[in-house]
Every structure is written in structure tokens, then in C-alpha cells.
Amino acid sequence: AKSLQRVISKVGNATLMTNVTTASGFATFIITQSKLLTEFGIVASLSIIAIFLLCLFIIPIIYSFMPIPKEKHLQHLNKQWINQLGDWIDRTVKHHNIAIYSSAVILLAVSIIGIFQIKATGSLIEDMPKKAEFYSDIEFYESEFNGVMPLEIFIDTKRKKGVMKLTTLKRMSKLENLIVEIPELSKPISVVSLVKYSKQAYYNGNPKYFQLPTAQENNFILSYAKNASSDVDLLKNFIDSTGRYARITSFMKDTGIDKMERIEENIISEIDKLFPKERYDISLTGKAYLFQKGTKYLVRNLILSLALAIFLISLFMAYMFRSFRMIIISLIPNLLPLLITAGMMGYFGVPIKPSTILVFSIAFGISVDDTIHFLAKYRQELLANKWAIKKSVFAALRETGVSMFYTSIVLFFGFSVFVTSNFGGTVALGILISATLLLAMLANLLLLPCLLLSLERSIANKKILKKPTLNIIPEEEPRQEDKNRRL
């Protein structure tokens, strides 16, 4: 019972803060204004806090009814490879700090170059399993019909029966000619095609009359088009009942967001030339256009959520350590892995899209947990060792290094499970988060202690490293050996 009480009193607050920072990383998705991501952020953050409370209350109760662990149950703590790992970390931090800094700077420089190669793109079906039957069906329709995603141009003539004016039809025809020249788009369908077919039919199907009517032909050709079907008025598929509104429908191939943007720019520039704004209101719509705009909007919101996650976690660090320098030191080993991962995305051609931008908020919220544990233990060792810097750093490293390694490896393999998914976005999420957490572990085990040792004069004093607002890890109780010496 005393051991359980001691564990709770020693690590309870630290565990609370690590869970709060992780929950904050997920909670930032709430501001994305995407219903699915908002629900994900709420459920994930609340679940993390709920798990903390359950562990805090249930695990001690269960352990209180269990027998004391036998020696064989604790043998994993004394395994040779664990001691060798600790020795290697100590030697590396103590004797190779220049190599650590050089490696960090080189990786940062290379990553920045890679970041500039990242493209913000994405397509509707690129993450779907390539071996699925429906994927083959989509490819078939794309090859045979030049696209599967509708792109529509909505035209408001601002007056009744304005669509059927010959000037409007000619403007629409010129716009359709541009669309035909774009390889990613299918041949457009609109009232213009119906009018052209009507004229051709009027002249006994002669192909050379597949064109808009002249001013003299306009009235009787249009009446012919209206009466072309006795059952269905074909015009209703292209214009409204008042004749004021019309639409041009085309289908787009599954292309990246960057190509969609160029297509949109070309179409809009042509629209501005053909349709005077004082006489027409033109707008683009359709699934292709909405997907492109929605993806860009979502990426912007997710970048904002990442910035908010960094800001919130910085506030938590400020609340805990009350030192600006400690905030900077704690952020460096956690931001560096994010930059390296972003650089890797640039080099390997992984685009920024909703399924990959999620990585950074999640990974940052999780990786900062190790930093909190280490810095909290470091401060405790400083107080216990009367501000002896090196001794405190290596004592904290020995105390927390193994647990940081274990938790990071568990998380690494936990997220690696996503690699087995058939959905491309889930695979990318698993690979990138796993890689980021592994890099964050190395940064917290190697770079963070080096920073503390290098900046010892500027941070290891009572003015800078003030007593934390929240007593994350209480001061060590006097050991029995020390008590005996005093007696």
C-alpha cells in the first residue's frame, strides 16, 4: 500500500500533465470546422483524460489485491542490454555533444530544403486501395468518359429568358471550346449542345449544321428545340423555368489539387473575358471544385490547429516551470523531429493533405510527454544535488531514460500497425507518426541533455529555474542510508 501511495504521489502530477498535453494535441482538431475532425478531437481528448482517471483509480485498487511482485517479475529491469543502452546514452551525451549538435544542425538544414519541396495536393481516390474492384471501375470510367467528378459552371444572366439570347449562347459556346482543350476535362454538356443538335436535326442531320443558329434562324430553331421531345422538355436539364439561369456541366479526371487550381485559374480568366460582370454572375461548383476548395480549407485549418497545439503546450510548460528559457529548451527537441519528418515528406514526394497534416499535432502532443518527465526529474535532481548540473542531468537521464525508451517503442509499434491498412491515408499516418515519435525519442534522450549541459550557467539557478507552480514530482524523501548516517 505504501509503495502504491508513493508511486501516485511521485508520478501522479507528471502523468496528469503529460495526459493534458497529449489531449491538447488532439483537442486542437475541434477548431477545424470539419464535423468528422471535430468529433475525432472531442472523443480522443476526452478519452485520454478518462483513461488517466481510470488508471489513477483502478490500477492501484487492482494492485492492492495482488501479491508482491517476485524477483523474476522485475528481472527485465536488470537486463544487460538495458544497462548497455543507458551507458551508451551517457557516453554519447558526455563525450560527443558536438557530434549531436552537428547532426541536429545538418538534419535541420537538409530538412528545410526538403520542406520547400512539399506540395499541398491530394486527389479524391489516391488513398483508396488500388486492388479494390471499385477502383478498377473508376479507372474504366475515367478512361472512357474522361472523368468521374462533375465540374459545373453556373451562369446567372440577371434577366428572364436571358440564357436563350444568341449573345449569351455564343459566349457559352466559346467557354465550352476552352473546356474541350483542357485534357483533364470531358466534353461539356449544356443548352448550347442542345441548340446545335436542334439546328443539325432541322437540316436533316447534316453534320455541317452542328452550330449555333444565325439571328434569322434563332426563333424557329429554339422553338424546334423546345418541341424536340413530346415527353420531356430537354431544356429543363440545362436552364431553369424562367430562362435566367443556366449551367455547363463537365467531368474532371482524378487529378491533384495543384492541377485543379491551374484549371480553375484558366477557366476563371476566360470567364472574366467572355462574361461582363455587370451583365452576368458566374460561379464554379460541382464535386471537383468543392473537393479542391475543401482540401485547401482543411489543410489551412489543420496547420492552424498545429500552431495552437504548440502554443497551448508552451503555456503548460510555462505554467509548470515558469521560465521562458526552459520553454525554448523543451520545444527544440520536439519541434526538430516535426521538421525532419516534414523534410522527409518533401524528399519522398508525400504531399501535404488532410491525412498527412494530422501527423504533426498528434505526434507533438505525444512526444512532449518525455520532455516533461525528463525536465521534472532534472529539477528534482538539482534540488537533491544542490544545483550540481552534470550530476543532475545524468541522474535524471538514468532515472527516466529507460521509461522514455519503453514508452516510445510501444507507441512506435502501436502506430506502425496502421501500415497494414489498405487505405493510403491511414498508411501514411502510421508511417509518419511512428517515424516522428522515434526521432522525438532520440532528441529527448540525446539533444535535450546536451542543451541542459551547454546552457547550465544560464538556466541552472534559482532565478531562472524557479519552483514550479505545480509540484510535478515531489522532492525525494531522505533515503534510509542518509537517516542512519545522521543518527
What are these regions (language model features)?
Residues 1, 326-375, 416, 443-446, ...:
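Hydrophobic transmembrane alpha-helices and their membrane-interface caps
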Residues 2-32, 331, 366, 383-421, ...:
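Pore- and gate-forming transmembrane helices of large, multi-pass membrane proteins
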Residues 4-12, 16, 37-41, 45, ...:
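Alpha-helical membrane-interface segments at transmembrane helix boundaries
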Residues 12-31, 36-77, 374, 428-465:
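Transmembrane alpha-helices and their membrane-interface boundaries in multi-pass membrane transporters
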Residues 29-46, 126, 323-333, 347-362, ...:
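Membrane-water interface of transmembrane alpha-helices in multipass transporters/channels
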Residues 48-56, 306, 310, 335, ...:
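Hydrophobic transmembrane alpha-helical segments of multi-pass transport and channel proteins
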Residues 74-85, 280-284, 386:
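Short, membrane-interfacial amphipathic segments enriched in basic
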Residues 97-354, 453-487:
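Extracytoplasmic
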